[in-house]
C-alpha cells in the first residue's frame, strides 16, 4: 500500500487510465472492463483493475489540479511500478476552430503552475507526450473514424481564472485549458515512464457552450475508447 492508494503489490496493471473524476473511473470500469476488481477506495478516489480485449488495464481517479494528480502519479510509479499513464479528462476550448465534445491529443502542455519552476529554476522545461502512445491514439482514432486534434494545451493552477491571457495563448496555437497534463508529463519524464493526455472538450471559454456534469461523467465515450485502444 501507499499513502493514498490501498492496493497491494500486483493489483495495479502496468497501464493505468487516469480520469480526474473518481465516478468516471467507476463508469469506465463498469462499462468497458471485464473481471473488474476495486483496489482502492481511500478518500473516495476509486481505483479498478480489469481486462480490455484480454489486456490487463487499471483505472485510477486522480482528483483535480496539479497537486492532486501529482500525488497519484508519484505513488503509481514509485509504489506500483506503473509504466504507462493515460489521462482521460475534460478541458475548455479557447479557439473557435475547436468545438465542444471534440477530442484532443495533448502533444505538450504549457502552464502557469510553479511545479517546473520549483524543479528547474529559471529553465522553461517543456514536458511532452510519449510519441508511441500519441501515435497509437492517433492511429486508433483513424481506425474508429473519430476526429481528433493534436496540439498544445494549457495546464492552469486555477479553475476560476482571469481570462486576460486566453487570447494570447490561443494566438500561439494552444487548443484548450485544463489542470493536470503538465504535472503528468513532467513526472513521467522524471521517472522514465510513458504518458499521454486524451481530452474531451467539455465547455468553450469563448462561446460559453458547455456540457452537464452528468455528460462529463458518462458520455465522453470516444475519448475512453481511444485510451483503451492505446492501452493495448
Curated annotation (Swiss-Prot):
The record marks 216 as: Important for catalytic activity. It catalyses: a purine D-ribonucleoside + phosphate = a purine nucleobase + alpha-D-ribose 1-phosphate; a purine 2'-deoxy-D-ribonucleoside + phosphate = a purine nucleobase + 2-deoxy-alpha-D-ribose 1-phosphate. The keyword Nucleus does not apply. InterPro entries: DeoD-type (IPR004402), Nucleoside_phosphorylase_CS (IPR018016), Nucleoside_phosphorylase_d (IPR000845), Nucleoside_phosphorylase_sf (IPR035994). The active site is at 203 (proton donor). GO terms for cellular component: cytosol. A purine D-ribonucleoside binds at residues 4, 178-180, 202-203. GO terms for molecular function: purine-nucleoside phosphorylase activity. One of its GO terms (biological process) is purine nucleoside catabolic process. Keywords: Glycosyltransferase, Transferase. Phosphate binds at residues 20, 24, 43, 87-90. PROSITE patterns: PNP_UDP_1. Its EC number is 2.4.2.1. The keyword Lyase does not apply. It is an enzyme of class 2 (transferase). Belongs to the PNP/UDP phosphorylase family. Homohexamer; trimer of homodimers. Catalyzes the reversible phosphorolytic breakdown of the N-glycosidic bond in the beta-(deoxy)ribonucleoside molecules, with the formation of the corresponding free purine bases and pentose-1-phosphate. This is Purine nucleoside phosphorylase DeoD-type. It comes from Bacillus licheniformis (strain ATCC 14580 / DSM 13 / JCM 2505 / CCUG 7422 / NBRC 12200 / NCIMB 9375 / NCTC 10341 / NRRL NRS-1264 / Gibson 46).
Amino acid at each position: 500500500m501507499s499513502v493514498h492508494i490501498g492496493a497491494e503489490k500486483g493489483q495495479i496493471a502496468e497501464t493505468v487510465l487516469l480520469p480526474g473524476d473518481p465516478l468516471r473511473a467507476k463508469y469506465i470500469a463498469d462499462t468497458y472492463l471485464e473481471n473488474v476488481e476495486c483496489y482502492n477506495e481511500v478518500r473516495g478516489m476509486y481505483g479498478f483493475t480489469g481486462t480490455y480485449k484480454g489486456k490487463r488495464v487499471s483505472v485510477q481517479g486522480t482528483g483535480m489540479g496539479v497537486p492532486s494528480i501529482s500525488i497519484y502519479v508519484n505513488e503509481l510509479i514509485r509504489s506500483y511500478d506503473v509504466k504507462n499513464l493515460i489521462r482521460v479528462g475534460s478541458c475548455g476550448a479557447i479557439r473557435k476552430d475547436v468545438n465542444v465534445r471534440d477530442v484532443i491529443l495533448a502533444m505538450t502542455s504549457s502552464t502557469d503552475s510553479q511545479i517546473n519552476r520549483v524543479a528547474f529554476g529559471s529553465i522553461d522545461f517543456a514536458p511532452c507526450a510519449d510519441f508511441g502512445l500519441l501515435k497509437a491514439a492517433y492511429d486508433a482514432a483513424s481506425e474508429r473514424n473519430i476526429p481528433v486534434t493534436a496540439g498544445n494545451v494549457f495546464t492552469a493552477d486555477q479553475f476560476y481564472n482571469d481570462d486576460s491571457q486566453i487570447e494570447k495563448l490561443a494566438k500561439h496555437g494552444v487548443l484548450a485549458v485544463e489542470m493536470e497534463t503538465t504535472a503528468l508529463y513532467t513526472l513521467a519524464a522524471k521517472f522514465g515512464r510513458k504518458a499521454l493526455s486524451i481530452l474531451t472538450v467539455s465547455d468553450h471559454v469563448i462561446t460559453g457552450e458547455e456540457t452537464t456534469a452528468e455528460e462529463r461523467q458518462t458520455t465522453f465515450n470516444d475519448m475512453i475508447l481511444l485510451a483503451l485502444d492505446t492501452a493495448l
